[in-house]
Structures are given as C-alpha cells and as structure tokens.
C-alpha cells in the first residue's frame, strides 16, 4: 500500500462512521504515480459513490498529509497492471499444497448472478458479491450481507459459490446454514472427532454460512467459529455470511465476532422498490413460460410489497389458478386469485401501524409525530413515517397527509423526496430507515 494512502486511511477511519469507512473507503487501493495518487475502486458503483460523497474529504486529508506537494487524486476502476504487481509483491505465491479431495458444496446451481434481478435495493450487494466471486479472499473478506427474510441474500450466496466454481471447478466451497455448523460440531464432540471437524472447515477455499444470527447464545459454537474464521482469513480464503440484521445488532453474539464481521464489507439488502418487483415478476413469468402483461405485473407488485419470496408466491398462485381453471391471466383474474392474500397484507401493514412503529423506534410520542411541532427530533421521524406509508401501503398522497394530522399532499411528497435524498447521502439515516423497513416487512 502507498505510504501516503496508509496515513490517509488512518485519518479517514478516525473521522468517518465505521459503516461508511468500511463500505466505501477501505475497498479503495492506491498507486502513487508521479504527481498523482490513483485510487482504484473495485467497480463502477463504488467509484460513482466515492466521487459523489467522499472525494472532497479524501482530497482534504491528502493535502493535510503532504502540504508542500500534495499529489492530484485520481479515481479509477481497478485493477491496473501496477495494482496487480503491487498485490503480487504483497502476496508472494504460496507453496503448492497437496491435492485435496473436493467436498460436497450444497450449492443450488439455479441461483446465479445471471437470473438475479438487480434494483436500487440490492445493487451494492450484488456488485460486492460479484467482486468477491471474481477475487476470492482479496476483495471483501468477510462479505456480510444483511436484510429481512426473502430478499435475495441466499440467492447471492449461492451465486457467489457458483461463480467461483465456474472460474475454478476444483475449488472447495462449502455452503451451509449456521445451524448445520452447530450440529456438525456437536456430532464431532460426541464422536471424539473435533480435529476432523476443524480440518474440514478450516481448509475450504470459501465458506458460505447463512443466517449467522443463529449462533447467538451458543458459546461453544461461537468459540469454534471464531478460530475457524481467523484461520480462513489468515490463509486468504473467502468467508461470506448472511444475517437478518447488522452485526452490531445481533444480541447474544460475542463482541469479538461482531467486530470481525465488520472487517470486510457489511452490505444491506432492502425490500425491492416497485420497479424491481415488477422486473422480478416479469422475469419469473418468462422463466415459467408464462406471458404476463405489464398491467398484471404492476398490480401484483403494488399489492405485495413485503419481500421477494411472498412476491414469487403470489405469482405462483396466479399461474396455478390459471392452469387449473384454463382462464387467461387478466387483471380481474389476478385480483380474484389474490383476494384473500391482499386482504391479509392490508391488515398487517397500515399507516397507523407504521406511525406506532416509527414512534417506538425513535422513542417519541405518537401524538407528537402527528402534531405541528417542527423540531428536528420530530421532523425526521415524521418524514420517514410518511415515506414508509407511501412505500408500504396503497394509500394516495392526500390520504397519507390526512392521516398525519391533516397535512397537504405536497408535504408528503416533499417528505418522500427528502428521505430518498438522505438515504443516498447519510449512512446513519440509511441504517435507521432500513431497520424500520425490516421491522415492518417482517
């Protein structure tokens, strides 16, 4: 690493929130080239975000470190020849290990990057996953994907494994649920085979563990995984984890594990927006050989908002009903087929429930949320509640305004735009919004 950039990294780490630093700054690699400091981003998404939100801060820190002749900061997408040479120097080739028996990987070959529908809600997660699959043990290690149920975390995990195998069919990759890891360890202890257990998990090329939150409260399992994790990272083997929440929020998990889970890249997957939901429906229908009209896809996408699993379930119900009855899939037919499901969805998420949840989350009174008070401690939660009401219910802007103390629809529209702006520029705000979305969607 460039000496100058090493000093800058230390400075930025102390000044930026950990999530912002780990997500956007840590992945950058630096090459000093004459009067330039070239920062290499792993992909276009990271490049654009850093240019938009952090380039000013980076240039300021670079100037502070080298006041007399500060180099010009240039952002590019890696990797370049200089970067490759630098990495070869930093990581000399390891001695060839003896041939290993390939282990069963449990991967579902149907889950690949090619059929993962990308949208704003999962764009970063997909980009990071692809980067990991193409740079095993070097891009983001560990990669920690978190979000609610049925949003595509498991799909991405399988896609990573399948992409690694596509590039290296001899790679030893293990995918499993965290409860399987616990079960395997218990069996190993019972049969006095703990050394074989350690050998198996600590020598794979990539370990992909789903739903890591189930380690909570299991002290012996956490102890064993801690050492497995360390061994894999020391040997530059890839670790990918999924969870239903951010690492720091996992109760019953040791602090040393929480800290290590944040070493690489924690990246969130949110419930998909309407356009992504429609794209998913159209893609799934096409895969099933069904001609689904955009009108029907938009209807289903607008009414089923919680997660992708339920969205696909609704589509399967419509298709099955059409096949059983021999009727074409029209808008009226879809409404009829999903009538009870939509009624249940409407009962589960309503504006009053959103107001109550937001008030409890920010520890404010619900009456204050609906009042005319305009202090910052109330304005932000109120705007979030309005935006969530727009996203999670079928109410119009005027209807939402009425339910927020008789406000005008333009106030609701302004709130939605402000929330979108803050989601893109403020990591802490984004985390609060994602937490609330996850609570309500689950």
Curated annotation (Swiss-Prot):
Residues 84-105 are annotated as: Domain II. It is found in: Cytoplasm. InterPro entries: AAA+_ATPase (IPR003593), Chromosome_initiator_DnaA (IPR001957), Chromosome_initiator_DnaA-like (IPR020591), Chromosome_initiator_DnaA_CS (IPR018312), DnaA_C (IPR013159), DnaA_dom (IPR013317), DnaA_N_dom (IPR024633), DnaA_N_sf (IPR038454). GO terms for cellular component: cytoplasm; plasma membrane. Residues 106-322 are annotated as: Domain III, AAA+ region. The keyword Zinc-finger does not apply. Residues 1-84 are annotated as: Domain I, interacts with DnaA modulators. Belongs to the DnaA family. Domain I is involved in oligomerization and binding regulators, domain II is flexibile and of varying length in different bacteria, domain III forms the AAA+ region, while domain IV binds dsDNA. PANTHER family: CHROMOSOMAL REPLICATION INITIATOR PROTEIN DNAA. Plays an essential role in the initiation and regulation of chromosomal replication. ATP-DnaA binds to the origin of replication (oriC) to initiate formation of the DNA replication initiation complex once per cell cycle. Binds the DnaA box (a 9 base pair repeat at the origin) and separates the double-stranded (ds)DNA. Forms a right-handed helical filament on oriC DNA; dsDNA binds to the exterior of the filament while single-stranded (ss)DNA is stabiized in the filament's interior. This is Chromosomal replication initiator protein DnaA. It comes from Methylococcus capsulatus (strain ATCC 33009 / NCIMB 11132 / Bath). The gene is dnaA.
């Amino acid at each position: 690493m460039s000496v100058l950039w090493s000093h800058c990294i230390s400075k930025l780490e102390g000044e930026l929130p950990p999530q912002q630093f780990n997500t956007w700054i840590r992945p950058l690699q630096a090459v000093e080239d004459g009067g330039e400091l070239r920062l290499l981003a792993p992909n276009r998404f990271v490049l654009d975000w850093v240019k938009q939100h952090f380039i000013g801060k980076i240039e300021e820190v670079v100037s502070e470190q080298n006041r007399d002749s500060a180099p010009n900061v240039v952002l590019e997408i890696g990797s370049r020849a200089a970067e490759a040479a630098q990495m070869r120097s930093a990581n000399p080739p390891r001695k060839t290990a003896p041939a290993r028996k390939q282990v069963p990987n449990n991967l579902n070959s149907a889950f690949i990057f090619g059929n993962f529908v990308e949208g704003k809600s999962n764009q970063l997660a997909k980009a990071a996953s692809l980067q990991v699959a193409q740079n095993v043990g070097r891009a983001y290690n560990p990669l920690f994907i978190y979000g609610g149920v049925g949003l595509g975390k498991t799909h991405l995990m399988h896609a990573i494994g399948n992409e690694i195998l596509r590039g290296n069919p001899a790679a030893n990759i293990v995918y499993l649920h965290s409860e399987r890891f616990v079960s395997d360890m218990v069996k190993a202890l019972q049969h006095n085979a703990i050394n074989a257990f350690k050998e198996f998990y600590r020598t794979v090329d990539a370990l992909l563990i789903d739903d890591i939150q189930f380690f909570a409260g299991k002290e012996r399992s956490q102890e064993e995984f801690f050492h497995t994790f360390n061994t894999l990272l020391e040997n530059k083997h890839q670790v990918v984890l999924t969870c239903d929440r951010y690492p720091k929020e996992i109760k019953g998990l040791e602090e040393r594990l929480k800290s290590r889970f944040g070493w690489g890249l924690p990246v969130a997957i949110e419930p998909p927006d309407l356009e992504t939901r429609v794209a998913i429906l159209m893609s799934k229908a096409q895969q099933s050989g069904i001609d689904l009209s955009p009108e029907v896809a938009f209807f289903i996408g607008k009414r089923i908002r919680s997660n992708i699993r339920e969205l696909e379930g609704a589509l399967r119900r419509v298709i099955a009903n059409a096949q059983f009855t021999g009727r074409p899939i029209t808008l009226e037919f879809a409404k009829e087929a999903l009538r009870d499901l939509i009624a249940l969805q409407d009962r589960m998420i309503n504006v009053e429930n959103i107001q109550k949840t937001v008030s409890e989350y920010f520890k404010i009174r619900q009456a204050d949320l609906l009042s005319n008070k305009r202090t910052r401690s109330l304005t932000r939660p109120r705007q979030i509640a309005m935006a969530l009401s727009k996203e999670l219910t079928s109410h119009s802007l005027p209807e939402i305004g009425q339910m927020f103390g008789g406000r005008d629809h333009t106030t609701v529209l302004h709130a939605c735009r402000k929330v979108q702006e803050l989601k893109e520029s403020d990591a802490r705000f984004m985390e609060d919004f994602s937490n609330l979305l996850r609570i309500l969607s689950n």
